[in-house]
Curated annotation (Swiss-Prot):
The keyword Cell membrane applies. This is NADH-quinone oxidoreductase subunit B. Binds 1 [4Fe-4S] cluster. Its cofactor is [4Fe-4S] cluster. Its EC number is 7.1.1.-. It holds the Pfam family Oxidored_q6. [4Fe-4S] cluster binds at residues 37-38, 102, 132. It comes from Aromatoleum aromaticum (strain DSM 19018 / LMG 30748 / EbN1). NDH-1 shuttles electrons from NADH, via FMN and iron-sulfur (Fe-S) centers, to quinones in the respiratory chain. Couples the redox reaction to proton translocation (for every two electrons transferred, four hydrogen ions are translocated across the cytoplasmic membrane), and thus conserves the redox energy in a proton gradient.
Length: 158
């Protein structure tokens, strides 16, 4: 949290934007949208070795309880409407991480007739995590980048 000044009396001054964004970065609740092998690495990131809980990232089973969607794997044309439906059920503000080459741009199956060439054609993506499959460290880095992006946003209209 960016603190503009600390007084001798023990007062802290900051902006309301900084406080709201600080609370949002400390409580990201992702919903997994695992479609292929990248989902296994996403599960690794949630286990004890990487421990996403220390960053305030707690996986939720329902889109109504989550504010972050991690799309991991090959998105087919048949699955695209379901992805959009789940995204629309999420509460505002909501963010999306695209994990892996297949979710980013179609990956190995880019030229297949049934593959969507990137999930950003269906939902707006905030952070892209490259790799085939990306490691758990790469996903962790992507989540930290998303937290930094959230800290920089203005939540209150001026």
């Amino acid at each position: 949290m960016s603190i503009e000044g600390v007084f001798r009396e023990g007062f802290v001054t900051t902006s309301l934007d900084a406080v709201i964004n600080w609370t949002r970065t400390g409580s990201l609740w992702p919903m997994t949208f695992g479609l292929a092998c990248c989902a296994v690495e996403m599960i690794h990131a949630g286990c004890a070795r990487y421990d996403l809980d220390r960053f305030g990232v707690v996986f939720r089973p329902s889109p109504r309880q989550s504010d972050l969607m991690i799309v991991a794997g090959t998105l087919c044309n048949k699955m695209a409407p379901a992805l959009r439906k789940v995204y629309d059920q999420m509460a505002e503000p909501r963010w999306v991480i695209s994990m892996g080459s297949c979710a980013n741009g179609g990956g190995y199956y880019h030229y297949s007739y049934s593959v969507v060439r990137g999930c950003d054609r269906i939902v707006p993506v905030d952070v892209y995590v490259p790799g085939c499959p990306p490691t758990a460290e790469a996903l962790l880095y992507g989540i930290i980048q998303l937290q930094n992006k959230i800290k920089r946003t203005n939540t209150i209209a001026r």
